[in-house]
Amino acid sequence: MKTFVLLPTGEGRTTDDLQFLEFSAYVERALTARGYQKATDFASADLAIFLAYGIGDPQTDTYTYTLPVWGQTGVASSTTTGNVNVYGNTGTYSQTTTNTPQYGVKGYTSHQGSNTSFTRHAYLTAYDLVSYREKKKEIVVWETKIESAGSSGDLRLVFPVMIAASRSFLGISTGKIVVVNLREDNLPVLEVRGLPIPDGKAKKKE
């Protein structure tokens, strides 16, 4: 079983950083599920795993769409009724025409909308500490790059979902980009967050 220490990377980040402490707990649970064990200290660790994370600037895309305008488009039918009134040698005639309107799409209106999205990322890079102690060489054992895009700009909300999505692939080579779709209430996310598992959610093997 490989032991590890998890360290932050990025300007101004330390192991005492509150956000790192929160995020590292998610990563540690994911690594434990993959068979890794958190080392008691740096000297006893087999791997030093560096965690980088961040979120990009919002990107807004605009689009145009049309909506139908409903209304009267014509006359479907007409009905005419008449009356004849006779007074002696004189008669009058009157008539009434009733039109039944026809309704449908009489045109379209143009509108504009927009979508704002954020790109979120988390990078995990594992270095071989045993080799470093013996040969003073920095050897990367494995690296996992996680990226997601969506409407949420709250990295704290999205981060555990990203880690849960990558959990099955930590420490292995996928050979390609892997796309994973998860929701906040999916089992891997609940496990990474350390939340109680509701009844009815069976444990899935990774």
Predicted regions and their residues:
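C-terminal/domain-edge helix-coil "capping" segments
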Residues: P101-E206
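Low-complexity, flexible helical/coil segments
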Residues: K38-S44, V84-T90, P160-M162, V178-D185
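Surface-exposed short loop/turn segments
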Residues: L51-E134
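A structural detector for beta-sheet-dominated domains
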Residues: L7-T9, A52, Y87, A149
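Envelope-exposed proteins and targeting segments
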Residues: K2, V27, R34, A45-L47, ...
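Generic structural hydrophobic/aromatic packing signal, biased to beta-strands
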Residues: L6, I49-L51, L124, S166
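General N-terminal targeting signals
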Residues: F23, I55, T66-P68, L157-F159, ...
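A structural "domain/chain start" motif
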Residues: M1-R34, A39-A45, G56-Y63, N181, ...
